[in-house]
Regions:
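Conserved acidic, metal-coordinating active-site core of Asp-based
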Residues: 106-206
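Asp-based phosphoryl-transfer active-site loop
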Residues: 2-22, 45, 204
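A structural signal for isolated positions on well-ordered beta-strands in alpha/beta enzyme cores
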Residues: 42-44, 125, 192, 211
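Active-site phosphate-binding/coordination module
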Residues: 24-118
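Mg2+-dependent phosphoryl-transfer enzymes with acidic/Ser/Thr/Gly-rich catalytic loops
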Residues: 2, 26, 167, 174-243
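Short amphipathic alpha-helical segments
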Residues: 19-20, 55-59, 79-80, 139, ...
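Active-site flanking residues adjacent to catalytic metal/cofactor-binding acidic residues
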Residues: 8, 68, 195-196
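A general structural motif
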Residues: 1-3, 40, 63, 123, ...
């Protein structure tokens, strides 16, 4: 297995419970990240986290760039690029529009609740939690005149239920990976993706090889699954690339 770029989910994959990057065998993960840096392999976080969170993560771990808010925000050094899909409005962020135009009221009426405190500082997607049929909720949004946004399932919460993003239609992790590959001229075959949820498997067609870490949702049927959980699983894949 070879690759010049490794896309990696953050929560539940790169970091363990509580956002702990040293969960499990922390030195092993740090060693693998250092090995990738020395070998010129770019490790790129792809996450639902906000722009500020991803910028700080990249700075702390020495990562070259990152993809925030489920593919909507691309960061590289001081450069920030917004990829907002079907969002049609100027002069405001998608989240500002969601809050101002009653979009949030539609989804809250379907049994979801804000996933606080994690909405602070968000620009493109709004975090919700609960358990719904996301396609049905997205259809309700379209019927209410808000077809520019949709509900996206981003995985299972430790305490039960799912976390969802209210996001511009046409965005998502897979779209973020495609945009990053195109921007940097990276061939599909030269990439690997590591994640733990269905939203990560959605990226499989856009990379050369896709892996789930050992703690990934058990109902996900996928042949490439690491033995280790969280960062140990990430290190397992990176070590194969470095061998």
């Amino acid at each position: 297995m070879t690759a010049s770029t490794v896309y990696v989910d953050v929560d539940g994959t790169l970091v363990g419970p509580g956002g702990d990057v040293l969960a499990g065998d922390g030195p092993r993960l740090i060693g693998a990240l250092l090995g990738c840096r020395a070998a010129g392999i770019a490790v790129v976080p792809v996450t639902g986290r906000s722009r500020i969170q991803v910028r700080e993560l990249c700075r702390l771990l020495g990562l070259p760039r990152g993809i925030a808010e489920l593919g909507c925000i691309h960061l590289e050094g001081r450069e920030v690029r917004y990829e907002l899909g079907a969002f049609p409005f100027l002069g405001e962020t998608p989240v500002e529009r969601m809050l101002r135009d009653g979009v949030l009221d539609v989804v809250l009426a379907q049994g979801l609740e804000p996933h606080e405190p994690w909405n602070e500082g968000r620009e493109a997607t709004y975090l919700l939690r609960g358990k719904v049929d996301e396609a049905a909720v997205s259809a309700r949004l379209a019927a209410a005149g808000h077809s520019w946004c949709e509900v996206v399932d981003n995985g299972v919460l430790r305490r039960g239920g799912h976390v969802y993003h209210l996001a511009p239609t046409g965005t998502g992790k897979a779209h973020g990976v495609r945009v990053d590959r195109r921007h940097h001229g990276i061939a599909r075959a030269d990439t690997v993706y590591i994640g733990d949820a269905a939203s990560d498997l959605a990226c499989a067609d856009d990379v050369g090889e896709c892996w789930l870490v050992g703690n990934a949702e058990p109902e996900l049927d996928w042949p490439n699954r690491t033995t280790g959980a969280h960062g140990d699983g990430v290190a397992e894949v990176l070590e194969q690339l470095l061998a």
